[in-house]
């Protein structure tokens, strides 16, 4: 495998709107990010991914871009962005941005021109189609609910939007449009950007027949991803995208890819794959309900363990995945993946250890490093997220009570991850001096950066030790390129794997069960590298031991001989 500059890096996702507000408007900004670069450096972060900061009406929190060449004034100026790039470079850190090119905003000048002339040049930048007998061209349900087709006023035409109606899909069959997108991407890379996280990219290839599918709900519609799955040829578009942009700059790219078959992995992340890496959503997909959040199944430990370890085995033959516990589109991992008895600092450290030491590129989401959890929501009116409001309506339509629908949103809403970063126990968690754009989690006085900075045994300081171990001179090679070998898969409540190469063998073993567990080693302990219950130097595990006892929520990382 050809070695790349990003293989041994640790990444951190910032949701700018909720990170830190420095100008008192209740919204996070670029100046806030600049002011916290040293904090991120102290965590061991190499790559910072910024969720969208482009000019936008913010119907979908910036994933509806109205100008690809401008910074949203809510976040700051292009000069401040350039300063961020320069300050990151001084610290040997890389900035990547969200790249949203499946769709744009309905306020983008291309779409505005298309609306004025639905038969003109710019209409072909989108998917305008005639309706059928007064109905939309096909029966697709958008990802946010309702038809994927929106009527163009005063005409018999509709335009396609797989997300909100304010997010018209771009027509990737149009070569002129593709070239304009490539020019824009290269403009940012020329600025000094190190790469992109690429949003919803599989959706760019449509089945141009737009066939109807069997309805899968009482609304008479079918999920739009069925149309995407029936389309062929996305690889050709992705290859052209890479060759015209990323490849020229040795840029780091991480794709948001769902519905991919295991046999397609080499094409996506192999030696000459479309992307540097793709996110591993195997655990997140376990809570996909048949109809949405309201019937999302509870995640079973054995299924979760099997999903992660199986994904590791199928991936390492070809390349790297980006490992996550949570992101801006998911609820908090501590609330989602840990049983109630483990939703404490020890359990949160345990979950972090298991994720960060997997083979692949770790992505830490803002607040994960202090153990932020889901918020308590008292009313649907407290939410901002467009998807949450849609799921609430869907739950009510399916017959759930308001209390049940609200509880489902509380478990799964994206707004759980979007509550403001908890910097201190001061008003609004130190995020802003104004009214925050989204409510602050009530637990901020107990869970915040300032308090954890002072506590050597905090989740934050544990994450620092964890990342430092992964990047240490002694173990960086092993944790980057070593194999991941599942272990103790038949032992109840135990999540374990070896990271090994020709020179070393390290066991990562965690007890997710509610009772003490005991395991017999294949070998003996040479050194304790990390423990979430004691300093490694003070560990009660003896060198030479051939058995390990783990309390509930205990994780050990040991060098084995």
What are these regions (language model features)?
Residues 2-186, 190, 203-263, 270, ...:
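Acidic/aromatic-lined carbohydrate-recognition and catalytic surfaces
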Residues 217-220, 286-287, 329-334, 439-447:
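Short acidic (Asp/Glu) and glycine-rich catalytic loops that position anionic groups and cofactors
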Residues 1-55, 82, 87-88, 361-364, ...:
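Carbohydrate-interacting/catalytic domains
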Residues 168-178, 225-230, 333-346, 407-408, ...:
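Active-site rim elements
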Residues 94, 98, 195, 252, ...:
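Hydrophobic "anchor" residues on beta-strands that sit immediately upstream
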Residues 36, 87, 184-187, 191, ...:
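Generic, well-ordered alpha-helical scaffold segments in large soluble proteins
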Residues 48, 196-198:
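Hydrophobic residues within beta-strands of alpha/beta enzymes
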Residues 106-139, 143, 238, 242-420, ...:
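Conserved alpha/beta catalytic core and glycan-binding cleft of carbohydrate-active enzymes
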